[in-house]
Amino acid sequence: MTTRYIFVTGGVVSSLGKGIAAASLAAILEARGLNVTIMKLDPYINVDPGTMSPTQHGEVFVTEDGAETDLDLGHYERFIRTKMNRRNNFTTGRIYEEVLRKERRGDYLGATIQVIPHITNAIKEKVIAGGEGHDVAIVEIGGTVGDIESLPFLESIRQLGVELGRDRTLFMHLTLVPFLGAAGEVKTKPTQHSVKELRSIGIAPDVLICRGDRAIPANERAKISLFCNVEERAVISLKDVDSIYKIPALLRSQGLDDLVVKRFGLECREADLSEWENVIYQEANPNGEVVIGMVGKYIELPDAYKSVNEALKHAGLKNRVSVTIKYIDSQTVEAKGDEVLQGLDGILVPGGFGERGVEGKILAAKYARENELPYFGICLGMQVALIEFARNVAGMADAHSTEFNKATPFPVVGLITEWVDEEGNVEQRHEASDLGGTMRLGAQLCHLLEGSKAAQAYKGNTCVERHRHRYEVNNKYRERLEQAGLVFSGLSSDRKLVEMIELKDHPWFVAGQFHPEFTSTPRDGHPLFEGFVAAASAHQKRDLKK
């Protein structure tokens, strides 16, 4: 199979939405029957984002094969059916690490290792390998043109453009076309300078995606075409919209997919965007609203919970309600108590690391349990629910996780020292292990308890979900917790690790050690999120009747 490559770069400012634009184009091409994948090349020196602060970088998205990747890969999976893997995201740090490892082994036979050709060759090899087996591979280059960190990546794709030829490569550049209120007009000069910068390093864009808060007038598009040496039909206006799921149709209406298909000489059907039209209709026509309190510690940056936010919205679509997320700092719960939890239709406690704010999460779980408020715990959210139950129901007053208190008399949650990975291999860890790349990661099979809410949600006795954690339920206390009424509704493939818990006599109190948000999509949703939002809606209706 001959793979075609679309390289997506950004200019003027960061955070223009290259990932959404790339994913939207991929969705249109997929709707035309093409097999599409997307890659993200990140210019930072970290080997992966696994140890980066969520408040700086946003969430870490985990792929099926256990790669800790950029949150843009979450966008990719939500827009197309192709599942991402570790080949879909790599960083400057990983490239340098691999090149230096080869140098130490003597693979370069004494050569002087340089950015060109050794680093650029390593980048090109990964891009080609990531695109194998697909009709089209869209490659997003992180950062902004002009950043020193991005230069090796830009040089690599320039070389690929020459080596593969114009019939297999296309360069798409995303820029900002701002509107100046005082002048009453849009300004194209930033775009012109961005393209000039790109051309100075040898890349001439074939398509310009021009971002702005309004549609760009035809005369300004003609001006951009003239000064940037890009066909006028290839100057695409991408205005702000109230839903990212409207972007595929917006790009399709301007013929971006036709331009790509003709450039590559591909024969394929017209795009069928009916599934996306259905998503947009459901989003615009809810029959009600629910308020979900998300009790977390990284709430100053909502992107730290990007996949959870999107999964709640997807569940709202399936339940025909709009979901309003109320972000609640868990430290505020510690300081003010349950008064900040009033008026919610459900509580969700997401994952997290470190002791800060953990008692607030435990209080949130207690409030939900005692007030029969729907509760959904994810990763740490499951652990705090179990700790709360152990303390206040099972009679273990000082129960805790050894992550937060190594001297606790009741370590109901402890470090996982051994587990079986998705390929059946035994993994081992200890307290002195590195932080990076040492967690239980990736898709794992889970056995569900027959008759449990979990089994009802999944409509079966097994599920496969993605993990990212170091700590687990301590099996020493399982029997005591079960006797107190806690239901262990999900177990690992070898039945040695607890994957899900729930409360039997509660409208909806379910928690999982895994991260179900990573597999939720706008078209398909996710059974646990759907069940949670349905329970929140039912709780709201009961309150209204009272």
Curated annotation (Swiss-Prot):
Domain of life: Bacteria
Binding residue positions for UTP: S14, K187, T188, K189, P190, T191, Q192, K223
Residues the record lists as binding ATP: S15, L16, G17, K18, G19, I20, D72, K239, D240, V241
UniProt enzyme class: ligase
GO biological process, one term: 'de novo' CTP biosynthetic process
Gene encoding the protein: pyrG
Additional notes on this entry: CTPSs have evolved a hybrid strategy for distinguishing between UTP and CTP. The overlapping regions of the product feedback inhibitory and substrate sites recognize a common feature in both compounds, the triphosphate moiety. To differentiate isosteric substrate and product pyrimidine rings, an additional pocket far from the expected kinase/ligase catalytic site, specifically recognizes the cytosine and ribose portions of the product inhibitor.
Reactions it catalyzes: UTP + L-glutamine + ATP + H2O = CTP + L-glutamate + ADP + phosphate + 2 H(+); L-glutamine + H2O = L-glutamate + NH4(+); UTP + NH4(+) + ATP = CTP + ADP + phosphate + 2 H(+)
Pathway terms, separated by semicolons: Pyrimidine metabolism; CTP biosynthesis via de novo pathway; CTP from UDP: step 2/2
Primary role: Catalyzes the ATP-dependent amination of UTP to CTP with either L-glutamine or ammonia as the source of nitrogen. Regulates intracellular CTP levels through interactions with the four ribonucleotide triphosphates.
Species annotation: Shewanella sp. (strain MR-4)
Protein family: Belongs to the CTP synthase family.
Name of this chain's protein: CTP synthase
Alphabetized UniProt keyword annotations: ATP-binding, Glutamine amidotransferase, Ligase, Magnesium, Metal-binding, Nucleotide-binding, Pyrimidine biosynthesis
Record HAMAP family: PyrG
UniProt: Mg(2+) binding residues: D72, E140
Residues in Glutamine amidotransferase type-1 domain copies: 291-542
Gene Ontology MF terms: ATP binding; CTP synthase activity; glutaminase activity; identical protein binding; metal ion binding
Binding site for CTP: S14, D147, I148, E149, K187, T188, K189, P190, T191, Q192, K223
Pfam families hit by this protein: CTP_synth_N (PF06418), GATase (PF00117)
Region of interest called Amidoligase domain, as start-end residue ranges on this chain: 1-266
Notes on how activity is controlled: Allosterically activated by GTP, when glutamine is the substrate; GTP has no effect on the reaction when ammonia is the substrate. The allosteric effector GTP functions by stabilizing the protein conformation that binds the tetrahedral intermediate(s) formed during glutamine hydrolysis. Inhibited by the product CTP, via allosteric rather than competitive inhibition.
Cellular component GO terms, alphabetical: cytosol
PANTHER family: CTP SYNTHASE, CTP SYNTHASE-RELATED
InterPro entries for the chain: Class_I_gatase-like, CTP_synthase, CTP_synthase_N, GATASE, GATase1_CTP_Synthase, P-loop_NTPase
Subunit structure: Homotetramer.
Binding site for L-glutamine: G352, L380, G381, M382, Q383, E403, R470
